[in-house]
Amino acid sequence: MQQWCASVADLVDDTLVRRLASPSDLRSGREIAATGGVEFVKRGPLRVVARVKGGQTRTVELLSGASGLEWSCSCLGSRKHSFCKHCVAAALETRWRSPSRRIA
């Protein structure tokens, strides 16, 4: 039986991002996203890969898995399993640019 997974854009709501990120990473990630620091490499419903500026350019991958959102970033902060500023920026841009989230 095939299991249904929500899209990455559906998973990265404000509540989840606030819960996963530290206050400083949340602030920095919002600033990076607001200033155009996110460039999508691949953007599909279940997998997003982005290059994110923030000091140095890092690569972020967001995945929709059976247990919810999975993520990785090439920065040192993410290696500690934290939702770093780069992940925040990529998540916010994914949500903001999702066709189902646009306001007409």
Report the location of each language-model feature.
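Long, low-complexity, compositionally biased intrinsically disordered regions
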Residues: 1-104
